[in-house]
């Protein structure tokens, strides 16, 4: 409990939520609309919006008036059993102090950029909201970054400040001389470091009195770096409208969160999904955000956490659910879990069914990008079509388009497009910062071209095929890599795979699979195993999709966000640099 005591002494606050309180029945079923804060509809465009004043401070007032149950706004734990519970009143106090540190101590102004590279620690929430209060543009980044990744982000963004931990401080120091815009370095640590400001002590001594800026809905709020699967990461710039979209009724239907919910998003803090799932979505509904520090991913710890804490909803990548299912537990019937959502990579229909069978909870799928947030999904309570990404979520009008922006009929392969004309929808990125060429490149007629390929069926459900650059044209047949990778994943030998096109003197292109084997299959004869895997794919999907070439590898090239870099493998196949 030493760390817990440090938090209490450090921030100078009392722990107002010593235990978890189930909401009174009359509050338990109240969603955002029931709390009287749903001021906008799906297609409204208010002139002003600020998540800190319109959401966080609203729930602070609800707590003062006794209109919200005494559950914490943020419930943070670590693997040592320490806990931090902050109410909305405490979050308002601490984020106002943070805002004053950023503006008064650091001298940052509205529109300045701040690089935020923190793990799942409470200070991540303070900095995010502190930036929103002041109009400082925050740029989340994963702690998996190396010095060259940090250098690139600091240089292209012109960041004036960075907030990180002592683990990454040496990496920052090694590149700081090459970043002339960087003026302020804030350290989140129990130890001081020369050349760095002590974030915690500054927040503790700062004034809690702060007037939130009156931000325009279309003023910039955050920059999210894309995954960089096809080149250097781009800076997708988002307005305050990105946070406003979580207010809209159609978006509320995706998770249908209540004040009594305890919501756990397992996304890395450097990804846009964390901003949505660990900040915007749950707090818009007045729910409790649950966070586990999880310095190392361990499915056993995740399972034990579900049993130990009253978590009601979960949002995580398919790999998280997959690893949970692979553990040898006699029961996965978590006592309070009601709803699960996933996205970010392909999910096998068999995995959805297995999750439902072992946990008794349905697993809903969603789709999005750094540019869009969650743009379509299977809403809670909606019919699940296993393997589908669900339907478009307003205000996004999503269609399947060709390369000229023409809408395609159902069951026809094309690009996933989001209508941007005559009006760009609230919640879609503004543009790629400092990259007008790329911004223009993704505009296709009346649509933003996501670069992802899919089909849409007669009921409006989308079916993902892959990135446009990833789709393989084999002997006239178009093959999406996700289809083949899903088929391979059903075989027990395959830990993970990446499917790309490979040159062939007769067919032009053929399907090739790079496969990482599970350890127990590593001693198998490669030739025999290749034939077995090829036959397996033929048996579970259209035979023309099977990989004519197979290469076993120890690992796959990935971006720092964990996405497979198929482009790198494809270039290798075609002898490109």
From Swiss-Prot:
Pfam families: AMP-binding (PF00501), AMP-binding_C (PF13193). SUPFAM superfamilies: Acetyl-CoA synthetase-like. Residues 1-31 form a transit peptide. The modification N6-acetyllysine is found at residues 146, 204, 214, 356, 391, 531, 538, 549. One of its GO terms (biological process) is acyl-CoA metabolic process. GO terms for cellular component: mitochondrial matrix; mitochondrion. It catalyses: a medium-chain fatty acid + ATP + CoA = a medium-chain fatty acyl-CoA + AMP + diphosphate; benzoate + ATP + CoA = benzoyl-CoA + AMP + diphosphate; (R)-lipoate + GTP + H(+) = (R)-lipoyl-GMP + diphosphate; octanoate + ATP + CoA = octanoyl-CoA + AMP + diphosphate. It comes from the Eukaryota. The modification N6-succinyllysine is found at residues 85, 146, 183, 204, 237, 356, 391, 538. Keywords: Acetylation, ATP-binding, Fatty acid metabolism, GTP-binding, Ligase, Lipid metabolism, Magnesium, Metal-binding, Mitochondrion, Nucleotide-binding, Transit peptide. Catalyzes the activation of fatty acids by CoA to produce an acyl-CoA, the first step in fatty acid metabolism. Capable of activating medium-chain fatty acids (e.g. butyric (C4) to decanoic (C10) acids), and certain carboxylate-containing xenobiotics, e.g. benzoate. Also catalyzes the activation of lipoate to lipoyl-nucleoside monophosphate. Activates lipoate with GTP at a 1000-fold higher rate than with ATP and activates both (R)- and (S)-lipoate to the respective lipoyl-GMP, with a preference for (R)-lipoate. Monomer. This is Acyl-coenzyme A synthetase ACSM1, mitochondrial. It comes from Bos taurus (Bovine). The lineage of its organism: Eukaryota, Metazoa, Chordata, Craniata, Vertebrata. The gene is ACSM1.
